[in-house]
């Protein structure tokens, strides 16, 4: 066959007359002269693709379930490239080379542009129908296996110009945690408490008189608010505080639902059958999320939730001995409270310790919060009213704490409902030195004993020595080694916790920790922190980039990686608005980034036609990616073993946009990681492609032991030679070890195997040390945040040539073995969530920039005289055919030589259309009459070429 016929009909045309055609284009009704684009909010009502109308930050975590299956737009490009590799290997070796199919499997799994499609399937004539706003495409089911959408976010036509060539960069940066807004961690009086004045005294030396309260300047039962006069006196220890529970408005409905379950349980003679543990868990999870973090990262609560449900069943059983103690008749006890008492005991047993607001599991902290609404300070009341004590198997400190009351809880400033002027407690976090004045000769070794600082964090020599001995004897213990264990308890910021350290003592007097309102200097992290009062300056905003307090943490997405102690901040993806909108305003982060003094200079590195004033999200993300590259290379250059002995002083790590120029264009974080080794150890300036870089990292991560070393030797021979030396004698010999974490910590489609663990890092201070850098899901430690600021310290020229100490030398073998065996990034990911967001981001981008343009793309195989493809696309006419053809070609980065022809059909608002062809394809548009119906037909010809059969693509996809 050398000719293909595609009828173009209207909705009035009887489709039975064209049911035998392989492809039919059905035009939608004509639209008016005022037509300006598509209303994408109607996508959920059409058979297009699975995007819901929801807040954009919810949408990026949405699991597509309302669809008929998924399609991978680049599957043909990958399959053909794999076929070519297979063919070449057979010619060279005479046998199949097994890794090419493994490569294809990996490419499919690694893809981030999977499309969850909603289609109509017509059983009467076996066709699949794909909807667009401008037309419908009917495809014979035998030929529908490669059909996909090819939508475009149009570039704005006014003001600064967009650059929508590589729009996947936005999704990529977000998945790598490189597009986040930040708010400092914040604490308030628990909104589940009403704190009132119970008594007052003149000086802290006086005793509060039991049974004879006095009120000097305050009123009896006067409520205490952060920042008011009552609070100021409370902070000075002059007020005895009474704690009562209260229900915050935000969870009033959930508490009412719990009360209804409670009342039914009481009326039903306390039978356990009235306690639906799953229902309770769901309500408590909702409370936990609403009160602490509405958009926390999803955690796999399934196992813990089941344990909690079993504990609830046990605790509400009538034969439970502890329940019977709770039910003993004593004054102040009542059935209404007993319900919440049993619930929080079950939560505590599930957690095997006291539950706090900061508990990572919403259902457990929800149980605590719900109980606080009724009981006030839960554990104090359990001990004093219900004679229940925390178990001896809990943490030892929990036993002491049940005699005290804890009145502050951590809240998320992104969600906090607070008016300007409201007082809160927050953590101020600053870098001690944003830029160091250094020289190559002197290096930048950490000063662990700074002159300034009210409180200074210090290493504990005994604990450090114990860790070193463990490494020598047993190897690197990634689950056991913790940085907080390496520091002295006094002034240890990794042990600070305002929720646990601000309390009411046994006489209900407020006690603040000694570090409150004091700067703690943490030289090993180049940080100083201080908890103090601050005023809220902005109301809650839909834009997460808006700073809430008068003294916020200020850093852009890349600079944030230098703030090592992530527990003192909260992060949120810097997106605002909804998933589907015709026009909306983006987050102000783009304006802020475009004002960066180095914006134009950094973007100029790309040697692309960019508008250096553009606030287009794609341009700002390209800026961030280039800045990320420069910061990593500026930092790690000093960890390469070779360095000139130069006494010239300079600022470090000051970014110089003219440095580290490459041959090639940067599109992916994986390119940065791979080029680190190429640049410094292999002396290559050429930037590997995205696919090659991701493949290299995959091979390294999926191998282990000697096999991993072989993979390193294959791609980075000079680096691997450095790992193979027989004896590490000098400091310079071990400097390459700090490059190893970069192979494992980043990725847009990975999840860490462990929730929290530590990797070894060489640390340069007055002596060479080995320290555990903590990685994991807690405290936002994803990517390079866990190690980057530690890398700001590097040895002097003389230190590089010094002999290693015996203890460090003895640890190098175990450290190398750890990095050759570790499987950091082998955690399970929700592939259907991670890989299906390309359509979402393109649609969201269209609402910010120039609008939404749609297309459907499919392919036909050519079998003779050479095997190749032609692409066919039907689209709206909102952009030029030339741009659309360029977009089609970009789907074939690996096998573009096999795409021999393109047919591009553009449908105008008035429902006329035009056809453009390229390559081996020619076309004619003719009129066709069938009975009383008349339509257009597009005759597509490939002179000298023969179309392949229906299953040629199937065979290709199953090589």
From Swiss-Prot:
One of its GO terms (biological process) is virion attachment to host cell. One of its GO terms (molecular function) is structural molecule activity. It is found in: Virion. Disulfide bonds: none annotated. The keyword Nucleotide-binding does not apply. InterPro entries: Capsid_VP2_Orbivir (IPR001742). Its main location: virion. The keyword Cell cycle does not apply. Pfam families: Orbi_VP2. Keywords: Capsid protein, Clathrin-mediated endocytosis of virus by host, Host-virus interaction, Inner capsid protein, Viral attachment to host cell, Viral penetration into host cytoplasm, Virion, Virus endocytosis by host, Virus entry into host cell. One of its GO terms (cellular component) is viral inner capsid. The VP2 protein is one of the two proteins (with VP5) which constitute the virus particle outer capsid. It is the major target of the host immunogenic response. Responsible for viral attachment to target host cell, probably by binding to sialic acid. This attachment induces virion internalization predominantly through clathrin-dependent endocytosis. Belongs to the orbivirus VP2 family. This is Outer capsid protein VP2. The lineage of its organism: Viruses, Riboviria, Orthornavirae, Duplornaviricota, Resentoviricetes. The gene is Segment-2.
């Amino acid at each position: 066959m050398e000719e293909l016929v595609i009828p173009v009909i209207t909705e009035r045309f009887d489709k039975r007359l064209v049911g035998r055609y392989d492809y039919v284009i059905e035009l939608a009704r004509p639209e008016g002269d005022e037509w300006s684009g598509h209303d994408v909010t109607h996508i959920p009502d059409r058979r297009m693709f699975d995007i819901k109308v929801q807040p954009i930050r919810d949408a990026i975590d949405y699991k597509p379930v309302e669809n008929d299956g998924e399609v991978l737009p680049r599957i043909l490009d990958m399959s053909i490239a794999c076929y070519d590799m297979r063919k070449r290997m057979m010619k060279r070796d005479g046998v199949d080379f097994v890794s090419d199919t493994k490569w294809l499997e990996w490419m499919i799994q690694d893809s981030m542009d999977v499309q969850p499609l909603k289609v109509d399937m017509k059983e009467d004539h076996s066709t699949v129908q794909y909807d667009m706003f401008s037309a419908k495409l009917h495809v014979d089911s035998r030929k529908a296996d490669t059909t996909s959408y090819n939508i475009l976010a149009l570039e704005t036509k006014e003001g600064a110009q967009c650059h929508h060539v590589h729009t996947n960069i936005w999704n990529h940066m977000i998945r790598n945690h490189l597009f986040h807004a930040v708010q400092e961690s914040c604490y308030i009086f628990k909104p589940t408490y009403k704190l009132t004045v119970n008594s007052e005294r003149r000086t802290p030396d006086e005793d509060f008189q039991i049974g004879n309260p006095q009120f000097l300047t305050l009123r009896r039962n006067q409520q205490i608010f952060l920042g008011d006069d009552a609070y100021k006196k409370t902070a000075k220890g002059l007020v005895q505080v009474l704690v009562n529970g209260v229900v915050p408005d935000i969870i009033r409905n959930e508490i009412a639902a719990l009360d209804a379950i409670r009342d039914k349980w009481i009326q039903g003679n306390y039978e356990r059958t009235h306690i639906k543990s799953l229902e309770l868990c769901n309500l408590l999870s909702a409370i936990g999320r609403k009160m602490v973090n509405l958009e926390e990262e999803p955690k796999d609560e399934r196992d813990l939730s089941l344990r909690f449900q079993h504990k609830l069943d046990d605790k509400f059983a009538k034969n439970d001995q502890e329940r019977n103690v709770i039910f003993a008749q004593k004054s102040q006890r009542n059935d209404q409270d007993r319900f919440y008492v049993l619930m929080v005991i079950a939560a505590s047993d599930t957690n095997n310790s006291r539950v706090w607001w900061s508990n990572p599991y919403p259902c457990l902290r929800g149980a605590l919060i719900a109980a606080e609404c009724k009981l006030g300070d839960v554990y104090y009341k359990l001990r004093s009213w219900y004679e229940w004590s925390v178990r001896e198997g809990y943490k030892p400190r929990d036993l002491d704490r049940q005699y005290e009351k804890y009145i502050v809880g951590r809240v998320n400033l992104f969600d906090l409902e607070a008016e300007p002027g409201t007082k809160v407690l927050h953590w101020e976090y600053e870098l001690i030195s944003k830029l160091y004045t250094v020289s190559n000769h002197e290096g930048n070794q950490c000063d662990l004993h700074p002159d300034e600082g009210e409180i200074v964090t210090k290493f504990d020599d005994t604990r450090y020595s114990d860790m070193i001995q463990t490494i020598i004897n047993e190897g690197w213990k990634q689950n056991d080694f913790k940085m907080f264990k390496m520091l002295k308890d006094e002034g240890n910021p990794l042990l600070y916790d305002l929720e646990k350290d601000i309390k009411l003592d046994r006489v209900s007097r407020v006690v603040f920790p000694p570090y409150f309102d004091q700067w703690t200097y943490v030289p090993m992290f180049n940080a100083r922190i201080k908890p103090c009062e601050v005023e809220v300056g902005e109301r809650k905003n839909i834009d997460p980039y808006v700073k809430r307090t008068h003294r916020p943490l200020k850093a852009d997405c890349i600079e944030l990686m230098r703030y090592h102690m992530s527990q003192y901040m909260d992060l949120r993806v810097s997106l605002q608005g909804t998933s589907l909108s015709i026009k909306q305003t983006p987050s102000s982060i783009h304006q802020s980034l475009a004002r960066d003094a180095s914006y134009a200079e950094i973007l100029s590195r790309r040697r692309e036609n960019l508008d250096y004033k553009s606030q287009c999200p794609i341009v700002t993300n390209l800026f961030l990616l280039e800045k990320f590259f420069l910061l990593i290379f500026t930092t790690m250059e000093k960890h390469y073993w070779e360095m000139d002995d130069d006494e010239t002083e300079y600022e470090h790590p000051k970014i110089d946009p003219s440095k580290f120029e490459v041959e090639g264009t940067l599109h992916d974080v994986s390119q940065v990681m791979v080029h680190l080794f190429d640049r410094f150890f292999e002396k290559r300036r050429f930037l590997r492609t995205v696919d090659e870089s991701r493949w290299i990292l995959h091979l390294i991560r999926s191998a282990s032991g000697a096999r991993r070393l072989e993979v390193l030797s294959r791609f980075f021979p000079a680096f691997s030679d450095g790992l193979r030396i027989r004896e590490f004698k000098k400091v310079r010999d071990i400097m390459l070890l700090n490059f190893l974490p970069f192979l494992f910590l980043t990725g847009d489609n990975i999840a860490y195997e462990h929730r929290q663990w530590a990797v070894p890092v060489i640390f340069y201070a007055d002596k060479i040390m080995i320290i555990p850098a903590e990685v994991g899901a807690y405290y936002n430690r994803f990517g390079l945040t866990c190690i980057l600021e530690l890398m700001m310290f590097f040895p002097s020229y003389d230190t590089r040539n010094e002999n290693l100490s015996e203890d460090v030398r003895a640890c190098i073998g175990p450290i190398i073995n750890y990095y050759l065996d570790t499987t950091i990034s082998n955690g399970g990911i929700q592939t259907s969530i991670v890989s299906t967001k390309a359509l979402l981001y393109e649609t969201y981008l269209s609402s910010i920039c120039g609008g939404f343009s749609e297309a459907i793309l499919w392919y036909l195989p050519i079998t003779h005289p050479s095997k190749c493809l032609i692409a066919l696309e039907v689209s709206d006419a909102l952009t030029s055919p030339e741009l659309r053809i360029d977009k089609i070609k970009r789907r074939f980065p690996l096998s573009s030589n096999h795409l021999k022809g393109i047919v591009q059909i553009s449908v105008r608002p008035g429902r006329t259309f035009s056809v453009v062809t390229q390559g081996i394809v020619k076309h004619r548009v003719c009129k066709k009459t069938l009975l009383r119906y008349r339509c257009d037909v597009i005759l597509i010809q490939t002179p000298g070429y023969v179309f392949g059969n229906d299953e040629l693509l199937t065979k290709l996809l199953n090589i």
